[in-house]
Amino acid sequence: MNGKIWVLGDAVVDLLPDGEGRLLQCPGGAPANVAVGVARLGGDSGFIGRVGDDPFGRFMRHTLAQEQVDVNYMRLDAAQRTSTVVVDLDSHGERTFTFMVRPSADLFLQPEDLPPFAAGQWLHVCSIALSAEPSRSTTFAAMEAIKRAGGYVSFDPNIRSDLWQDPQDLRDCLDRALALADAIKLSEEELAFISGSDDIVSGIARLNARFQPTLLLVTQGKAGVQAALRGQVSHFPARPVVAVDTTGAGDAFVAGLLAGLAAHGIPDNLAALAPDLALAQTCGALATT
């Protein structure tokens, strides 16, 4: 199949500590990470979004282009500034994020920024693109448009609660996006937040009953992944790894998953899903080392 994978959302400059009291300028943002990951795996990826027409924005556009990501729909916005995030790491390699620019250029995405979609293509989005207008309406329009064209939607909430002024807006947008998604990737914490259950089996059952996604994956870190495909549920153990920095691990997992799904289609059963999930887990594990 090898359908194109469009990734919509924010391209972010991450400022990472170097251990010497300085911050390093690094390309980041979950959607941008996924787009680059797909391209590195040999997939056909394109980025949809806005960055500022500023040094950080031009840096991000150049970086993605160098990685063979289609940037024809990555707009430089002279009126807005590129999203910039300070990343802080604890002794276990876990991270916290401080968003320095709000609202940033990515939240000014307009319908005219969208490409024409085609059958067999994928669109991957995260909830940050839904956190404010006009990006929210444009993102939902993109999800609906690719479904009408015969394509597929992948959704990774990647919830950042501090970016939402109204908690009910967050829940309403999550519900709408989850209902449109063919493939959903959640963390355990996100599953509990959305389903209202701390039990992973119960949470998966509630989401499957409510939203009926074709594929639902719940990542559990070192414990592996719970996968629900067309009503079948199974656990896939994690690959052992010594984590140095978990930043971007979930994005690498999604890139591996989407590369497999775009190449082979959504499988009919869990046995057929196993190779694509193994690739996703390998990508996620390698990203932490």
Spans of model-derived segments:
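Conserved beta-alpha-beta core of the PfkB/ribokinase-like small-molecule kinase fold
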Residues: 128-206, 214, 223-224
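Short, conserved phosphate/pyrophosphate- and ester-handling motifs at nucleotide-, phospho-/glycolipid
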Residues: 38, 187, 250
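Short beta-strand scaffold segments in enzyme catalytic cores
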Residues: 36, 84-88, 224-227
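Structural alpha-helical scaffold elements that stabilize or flank donor/cofactor-binding regions
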Residues: 115-116, 176-177, 209
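Conserved N-terminal subdomain of the carbohydrate kinase-like
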Residues: 44-126
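Conserved phosphate-binding/catalytic region of the ribokinase-like
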Residues: 1-4, 144-145, 196, 200-289
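Glycine-rich phosphate/adenosyl-contacting loop at the front of the ribokinase-like
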Residues: 1-70
